[in-house]
Structure formats: structure tokens, C-alpha cells
Amino acid sequence: MGIGMDSSTMSGPLVAHSGILDGDYEKRPAVCKMQMRFDLANVGLRVLSLACSLVALVSMASNQESGVVTVFGFKLPVYSKWSYSDSFEFLVGASAAAAAHSLLQLLLCGMKMVKRASTIPSRNHAWLLFAGDQVFAYGMLAAASAAAGVTNLNRTGFRHSDLPNFCKPLHRFCDKAAISIVFAFISSLILGGSAVLDVFWLSKN
């Protein structure tokens, strides 16, 4: 007497997971395609986040300039440096931390893809990534907002005198600060996108 068994009704440890957790690409080509798209999106966001964080970091950490301004007929030397502002120091620190986070996750993703495994091996890992991406996203947003909202740059940026418009004699300093702030905002958005991608993965597993 033959006994028939419907594999679709089976449950337990012998049944393959229906989500995208498993990295067994050869046996499940449909899952492979979806998994590959997710992994490429994950790696792409990590690369962009790393690049933007590094631009924000380098632009600000190398930002200093000296010049001469004329006040009431007197020429006064002025000098500005990023470390004179607490907000700029915060931005440098946040950018360095975000860059380190992005680099670490990028390396881990690369190692997983070389082994043809999912870049997120478990739900616990996904939750950890989600928390980390959120922390760094809000950190970069706060740092960029603080740097953009600085109103007391005359005191922190000048050694010799208070001037109402220090960007006129030190335009290069202001331009580099603006570049750093813009890329910090972009990095924050990208890290937020990574957090959304983490949620997508969790919803599928």
C-alpha cells in the first residue's frame, strides 16, 4: 500500500523557510533573485553612506583659513579653524563614527556575499542593524543641524576681533563648512534609508 504525503502541509525543522533568510541560491532561484536585489541595495546604501560621511569628515577636519579684514582703516589678521566651534567638533566626531559604522557593515556585507549568503543572517542581526542605523542617522542629523545653526561663529572662529560677516574675508572656510554640512545631511538620509531596508527585511522574515 502506498502512502502519499503533501509536502506543502509539512511543518517543522525540515521545511525550508519561505522568506529571504536563507542564502541557498542554487536550490531556490526565485528567492535568489530577491535576495540578490536586497543585498545589492544594502551594499549600495553602505557605500553611499561611507562616501558621504568621509566627505563631511574630511571637508570639516581640514577646514581652516587665515585672512585680513579692514576695520576703520586698520587691517586686522583673522584666523578661523573648525576646532574653535563645539558644533563643528560634534560634526567631525559624528561623521567619523558614521563612517566607521558604514565601513564595518560594508566589509561584513562583502564577506557574506562572497560566501553567497544573506548579508543579514538572522532577525537579531537585523534588529541590531536597525538600531545602529537609526542611532547614526539621528546623530548625523543632529550634528549637521547644530553646525548649520551656529550663530556665534565670530567668537569661536576669530582670534583677534568680532566681525559681523566673517565669511567675506574667509570665504573658503565657509564654503568647506557648507559642503561638510550638506554631505552630513545626505549621509543622515542614507542611513535612514538603510534603517527602512532593515524593516523591509524583517517584514519578509
From Swiss-Prot:
Q: Which stretches are transmembrane? A: 40-60, 90-110, 126-146, 177-197
- Does the keyword field hold Transmembrane? yes
* Entry-listed glycosylation sites: 154
Q: Which InterPro entries match?
A: CASP/CASPL, CASP_dom
State where it is primarily located.
Answer: membrane
Q: Which GO terms describe its cellular component?
A: plasma membrane
Q: How does it sit in the membrane?
A: Multi-pass membrane protein
Q: Which PANTHER family match?
A: CASP-LIKE PROTEIN 3A1, CASP-LIKE PROTEIN 4A4
Cross-referenced NCBIfam families:
A_tha_TIGR01569 (TIGR01569)
Family, as annotated: Belongs to the Casparian strip membrane proteins (CASP) family.
> By what name is this protein known?
CASP-like protein 3A1
